[in-house]
């Protein structure tokens, strides 16, 4: 029934979770049967873990619950292609409760027929004789995910450490925000440095692990402490400037036993540490000389509880190093001066005067030795630098020589290649030029042949045309001549008509010229003014279509051609009469009376006439210039001069000016008409 419920609930599963398959016992294919058995195995495992018994008559609730478990197990681990060979286990009974871990693996033997439950009536099909592998055990996806997470985190961490060694920006980020990132990067950098420079690390380790020589053990004698004789112990420290009991100076210059022991220990230490470096050997005697002093002080304090009444304190001079520009020497001097300050503050400072003095000498020698070593090191460094410079110069010269050789060799090779390429290019260019010339020659020859053919064709066409023309001429001999004669006659008629028009125009022009001459003759030959209305009417009739002539005639005053105009002689004669009257009135003002007229008349008789061409603007000068213009026949300028008069002189010459204007108007009109007649003649020609 369990298998039946699985088969009935399988079509309800989505296609993405489990592919659709037919019923379990209706399948004939071996692969489908084994795949169905695998799904049933997982379903049984889920069912047994739940601790429930299978019912022979499944209901809807049981089927839906089993469907949910089968779907979860299928989605957790879908069967793969390798599950097709898994053998189908025997079907359990309705009351059986199995766990997946309690199911034993089947042996590698031919499978037997499947068993059915007591209530089942369907018999299982026979399995084929095959040896499938044992069913795989359930795998834990959580452990696999955790393993993948650890591997991914480890790879990411290793990649971050590796990239931190390559990028400075990522190094800052990695060491600041990633735990233990800085330690990992520093460890890799240190390993890389040791791999690149193994000798440097060896020297550092060797220098650090050098054992420190403690020197010989110093033994303090029993009598080197304080004594009950205060005066003898304070002989060297007696202050002669203070009041009180003076101590003897018999033993003032004798060194104490402690100083002797310290000097002996110092000599032993120097003999043992002679093979060490000078900077280490210089520090050891000072330490050995100063180490016993605190013990002595304690012993004295224990043995002599009483202090002298007036202890004499002797100040020890501080060490002054002339060559204290070295850091090591400065540190030594500072430490030694601190020791001196401590000893000077003690009451028994006089006991350490000797060791301090020798220590000063040792420090002085050490400073000198350090300076000498530094100088030697500088000299050796300079020598090495000079040697390196010489070697570099030699190597550079050798390199330059090699480069020159290679350059020369390359230049020769390039020159050879250039020559060969140039020859190839010249050869190819010459071949190309020859080919082009040959083609051009062939094209020119073909063009000449074509031109010759065209000329031959043109000559044949021209010959045929000439023959045809000759034939036509011979055929139409007289007819062609008649046509030519008719054309000539038509041309003559056209020319005759044109010349008739020219003759008419010339005739009218001549008539107009004759009429103008008649008007001029009438005006010049008359002694008195005569009207010339008929002559002017004849001119107007001949030039009826000419606007210029009509305008010139219209510009003449009607009084001029109706009454006539005076001649030149008449104008000159009248001017003389007018000039005599003007001279009489030339001195009159505008509002002159009878007395002024009489005075002007009298004075005019006295005044002399001017001759020539005067340039002034008085009345006499104007009259003289006007008379000269009239004698020359220049009436226009004469009228201009008379028009410039003022007052009574202009008033007296007003009538004469009007006659001169009419004469000038008529002359100007006649000149315009004559000019127009000449223009007509020129147009016809």
Curated annotation (Swiss-Prot):
GO terms for cellular component: MICOS complex. Residues 166-685 are mitochondrial intermembrane. Residues 356-494 form a coiled coil. The keyword Transit peptide applies. Residues 1-42 form a transit peptide. Residues 66-77 have a biased composition (Polar residues). It comes from the Eukaryota. The chain crosses the membrane at residues 146-165. Residues 43-145 are mitochondrial matrix. It holds the Pfam family Mitofilin. Residues 66-140, 283-307 are annotated as: Disordered. This is MICOS complex subunit MIC60.
């Amino acid at each position: 029934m369990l298998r039946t419920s699985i088969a009935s609930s399988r079509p309800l599963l989505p296609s993405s979770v489990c592919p659709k398959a037919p019923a379990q016992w209706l399948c004939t294919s071996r692969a489908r049967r084994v795949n169905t058995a695998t799904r049933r195995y997982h379903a049984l495992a889920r069912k047994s873990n739940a601790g429930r018994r299978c019912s022979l008559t499944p209901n809807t609730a049981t089927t839906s619950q089993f469907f949910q478990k089968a779907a979860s197990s299928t989605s957790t681990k879908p069967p793969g292609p390798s599950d097709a060979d898994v053998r189908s286990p025997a079907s359990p009974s309705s009351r059986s409760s199995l766990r997946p871990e309690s199911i034993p693996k089947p042996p590698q033997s031919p499978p037997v027929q499947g068993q059915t439950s007591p209530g089942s009536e369907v018999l299982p099909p026979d399995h084929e004789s095959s040896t499938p592998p044992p069913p795989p055990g359930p795998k834990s996806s959580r452990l696999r995910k955790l393993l993948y997470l650890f591997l991914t985190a480890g790879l990411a961490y290793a990649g971050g450490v590796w990239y931190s060694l390559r990028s400075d920006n990522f190094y800052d980020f990695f060491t600041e925000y990633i735990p233990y990132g800085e330690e990992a990067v520093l460890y890799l950098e240190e390993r890389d440095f040791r791999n690149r420079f193994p000798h440097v690390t060896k020297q550092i380790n060797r220098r650090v692990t050098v054992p420190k020589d403690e020197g010989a053990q110093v033994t303090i004698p029993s009598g080197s402490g304080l004594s009950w004789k205060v005066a003898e112990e304070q002989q060297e420290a007696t202050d002669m400037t203070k009041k009180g009991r003076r101590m003897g100076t018999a033993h003032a210059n004798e060194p104490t036993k402690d100083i002797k022991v310290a000097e002996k220990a110092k000599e032993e230490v120097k003999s043992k540490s002679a093979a060490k470096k000078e900077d280490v050997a210089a520090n050891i005697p000072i330490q050995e000389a100063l180490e016993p002093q605190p013990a002595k002080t304690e012993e004295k304090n224990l043995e002599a509880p009483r202090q002298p009444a007036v202890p004499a304190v002797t100040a020890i001079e501080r060490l002054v190093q002339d060559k204290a520009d070295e850091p090591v020497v400065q540190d030594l001097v500072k430490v030694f001066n601190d020791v001196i300050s401590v000893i000077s503050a003690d009451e028994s400072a006089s006991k350490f005067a000797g060791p301090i003095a020798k220590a000063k000498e040792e420090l002085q020698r050490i400073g000198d030795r350090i300076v000498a070593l530094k100088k030697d090191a500088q000299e050796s460094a300079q020598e090495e630098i000079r040697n390196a410079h010489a070697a570099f110069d030699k190597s550079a010269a050798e390199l330059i020589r090699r480069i020159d050789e290679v350059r020369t060799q390359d230049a020769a090779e390039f020159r050879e290649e250039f020559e060969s390429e140039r020859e190839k290019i010249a050869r190819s260019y010459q071949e190309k030029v020859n080919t082009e010339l040959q083609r051009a020659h062939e094209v020119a020859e073909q063009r000449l042949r074509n031109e010759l053919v065209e000329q031959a064709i043109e000559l044949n066409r021209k010959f045929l045309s000439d023959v045809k023309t000759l034939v036509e001429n011979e055929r139409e001999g007289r007819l062609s001549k008649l046509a030519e004669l008719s054309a000539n006659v038509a041309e003559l008629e056209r020319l005759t008509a044109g010349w008739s028009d020219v003759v008419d125009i010339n005739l009218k022009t001549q008539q107009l010229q004759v009429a103008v001459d008649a008007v001029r003759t009438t005006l010049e030959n008359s002694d008195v003014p005569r009207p010339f209305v008929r002559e002017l009417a004849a001119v107007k009739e001949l030039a009826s279509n000419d606007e210029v002539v009509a305008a010139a005639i219209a510009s003449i005053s009607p009084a001029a051609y109706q009454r006539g105009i005076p001649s030149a002689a008449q104008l000159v004669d009248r001017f003389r009469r007018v000039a005599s009257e003007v001279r009489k009135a030339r001195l009159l003002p505008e509002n002159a009376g009878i007395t002024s007229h009489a005075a002007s008349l009298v004075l005019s008789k006295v005044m002399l006439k001017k001759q020539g061409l005067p340039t002034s603007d008085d009345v006499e000068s104007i009259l003289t210039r006007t008379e000269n213009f009239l004698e020359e026949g220049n009436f226009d300028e004469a009228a201009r001069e008379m028009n410039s008069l003022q007052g009574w002189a202009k008033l007296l010459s007003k009538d004469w000016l009007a006659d001169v204007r009419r004469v000038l108007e008529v002359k100007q009109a006649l000149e315009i008409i004559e000019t127009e007649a000449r223009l007509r003649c020129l147009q016809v020609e």
